[in-house]
């Protein structure tokens, strides 16, 4: 189905109407070297899970188990970027993107997670990187974005074993050697403070192990030790530090790139204005954000975690502390929403400890029956644009103003089977969301925060993990029924005009800064 001329006329006037109702913002509000891009991951985009020598990942296995994914779907095809990357790069170039953040599939490079290299995988990523650069787009490469080679999970338990530290370092070095002459931005691991509790506390992500009470009933292994999430996280941190050390010792001076870690970073507000609730905010920040950032800045875990967890939190020797400390050139921040935090036990099912039960903090999106922000198509994600400024300025103050890249930010809409294509394309709420977030981010930069980039999640609608294809974040609509055809949404129009300094791409933000 093609988008009609009438549809574009309607979208154009919708955008004009949006402008009239909403201080002016365009790319000129940001530093001249500020990097705008979109973000993706291998499992969510590539497809081709059994082609050209790729080995299975833990996500390949999980999605073929009944009841794991909301719509019983999988990433076997996803958006088929493995075959359609040139088409997608043309879309990126048409938008005027500076960079494209994608991840490398570990099991496409090393089908068994270690050992023999799959040269077809090397060739694919070489072709992708070269095509991006030929179109003026910088590759921003993540080494691990949730999809662990299944062979490593089966062999020794994946992130629960210290063996993974050397295997990750070896895999990272293969990538530095093969692609580093052209890749100037590396991320070691994406959102360990999310995939670790999802995989080892509540059992929704691989390897579906449950350490928390009332966790996922489909856990492969229930009643696991409550120390497991912290052990897995410890090995993630040491693997990260080992990869950074290898990059700095052998490649960084020659290749001239930078390397960092990407963290999930919601902001939190106290449910009530009381010392107890403000303490709850500090505590959830310790158990979420600071769990991974304190070690790479200060060389140890937050004191709050040490006091509450005792021997369940691994010790860090002075040697390991020195290796961890300063193991980043930038911090990647993935920010989507803001929630209320409270120490009060739940009175309604909306309150939850969920991923961080040891914090004894309950999170909610409501106070006295009023949402913290507009609801979105995904439960737990609310529109609170000022949160991006607050989390950035918190990181600035707490960690002495490190370089920050907003590695993901996006607006989810639910897939409604009754929605027409035209309704799906008219995503005015997504435009307002990004416009307002960028206004607050611009304010944070003006206040002195060293933010260098902003990546929209995502270029395309894609496979959204346990939600399957029921949630859409893309600037482009993807028809998953009819050959993954891409259709530009109104937000793609707006982002193109915003990036190309077109006056019609300027928006008026409802924010008051």
Curated annotation (Swiss-Prot):
Question: Which residues carry out catalysis?
Answer: 191 (proton donor), 408 (nucleophile)
Positions binding a beta-D-glucoside in this chain are 44, 145, 190-191, 336, 408, 457, 464-465, 473
Q: What is its EC number?
A: 3.2.1.126
For this protein, what post-translational modification is recorded in UniProt? Glycosylated.
Q: Which residues are glycosylated?
A: 223, 447
Please state how the activity of this protein is regulated: Inhibited by glucono-1,5-lactone, but not by bromoconduritol or conduritol B epoxide.
Determine if Cell wall biogenesis/degradation is one of this entry's keywords: no
Characterize the pH dependence. Answer: Optimum pH is 5.4-5.9.
Question: Would you say which domain of life the source belongs to?
Answer: Eukaryota
State the UniProt keywords alphabetically: Disulfide bond, Glycoprotein, Glycosidase, Hydrolase, Lignin biosynthesis, Signal
Enzyme class comes to hydrolase
The record's section on Pfam families has: Glyco_hydro_1
- Region forming the signal peptide: 1-23
Q: Which reactions are catalysed by this chain?
A: 4-O-(beta-D-glucosyl)-(E)-coniferol + H2O = (E)-coniferol + D-glucose
Keyword Hydrolase listed? The answer is yes
Which GO BP terms, alphabetically? carbohydrate metabolic process; lignin biosynthetic process
Q: Quaternary arrangement and interactors, per the entry?
A: Homodimer.
* Function field: Involved in the release of monolignols for lignin biosynthesis. Unable to hydrolyze 4-nitrophenyl beta-cellobioside or alpha-linked methylumbelliferyl glucoside.
The family classification in the record reads: Belongs to the glycosyl hydrolase 1 family.
Kindly provide the name given to this protein in its UniProt entry: Coniferin beta-glucosidase
The organism is Pinus contorta (Shore pine)
């Amino acid at each position: 189905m093609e988008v009609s001329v009438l549809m574009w006329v309607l979208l154009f006037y919708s955008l004009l109407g949006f402008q009239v109702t909403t201080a002016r913002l365009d790319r000129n509000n940001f530093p001249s070297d500020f990097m705008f891009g979109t973000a993706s991951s291998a499992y969510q985009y590539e497809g081709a899970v059994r082609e050209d020598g790729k080995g299975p990942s833990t996500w390949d296995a999980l999605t073929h188990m009944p009841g794991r994914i909301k719509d019983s779907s999988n990433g076997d095809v996803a958006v088929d970027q493995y075959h359609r990357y040139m088409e997608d790069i043309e879309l990126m170039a048409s938008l005027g993107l500076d960079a494209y953040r994608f991840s490398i599939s570990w099991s496409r490079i090393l089908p068994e997670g270690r050992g023999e290299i799959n040269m077809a995988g090397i060739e694919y990523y070489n072709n992708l990187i070269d095509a991006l650069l030929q179109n003026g787009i910088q590759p921003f490469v993540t080494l691990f974005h949730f999809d662990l080679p299944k062979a490593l999970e089966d062999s020794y338990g994946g992130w629960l074993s210290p063996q993974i530290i050397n295997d990750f370092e070896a895999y990272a070095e293969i990538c530095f050697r093969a692609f580093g002459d052209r890749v100037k931005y590396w991320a070691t691991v994406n959102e360990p403070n999310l995939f670790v509790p999802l995989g080892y506390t509540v059992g929704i992500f691989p390897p579906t192990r449950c350490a928390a009470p009332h966790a996922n009933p489909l856990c492969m292994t229930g009643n696991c030790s409550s120390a497991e999430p912290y052990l897995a996280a410890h090995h993630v941190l040491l693997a990260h530090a080992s990869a950074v050390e290898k990059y700095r010792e052998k490649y960084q001076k020659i290749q001239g790139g930078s390397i960092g870690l990407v963290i999930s970073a919601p902001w939190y507000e106290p449910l009530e204005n009381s010392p107890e609730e403000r303490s709850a905010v500090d505590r959830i920040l310790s158990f979420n954000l600071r769990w991974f950032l304190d070690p790479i800045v200060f060389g140890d875990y937050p004191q709050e975690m040490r006091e509450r967890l005792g021997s369940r939190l691994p010790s860090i020797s002075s040697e390991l502390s020195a290796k961890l400390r300063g193991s980043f050139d930038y911090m990647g921040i993935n920010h989507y929403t803001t929630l209320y935090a409270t120490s009060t036990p739940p009175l309604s099912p909306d309150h939850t400890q969920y991923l961080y039960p040891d914090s004894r903090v309950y999170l909610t999106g409501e106070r006295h029956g009023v949402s913290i922000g507009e609801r979105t198509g995904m439960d737990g994600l609310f529109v609170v644009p000022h949160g991006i400024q607050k989390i950035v300025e918190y990181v600035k103050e707490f960690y002495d103003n490190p370089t920050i890249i907003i590695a993901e930010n996006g607006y989810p809409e639910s897939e409604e089977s009754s929605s027409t294509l035209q309704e799906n394309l008219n995503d005015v709420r997504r435009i307002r969301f990004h416009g307002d977030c960028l206004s607050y981010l611009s304010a944070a930069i003006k206040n002195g925060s060293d933010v260098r980039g902003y990546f929209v999640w995502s270029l395309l609608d894609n496979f959204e993990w346990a939600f399957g294809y029921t949630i859409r974040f893309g600037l482009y609509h993807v028809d998953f029924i009819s050959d993954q055809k891409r259709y530009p949404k109104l937000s793609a129009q707006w982002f193109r005009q915003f990036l190309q300094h077109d006056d019609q791409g300027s928006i008026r933000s409802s924010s008051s800064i």
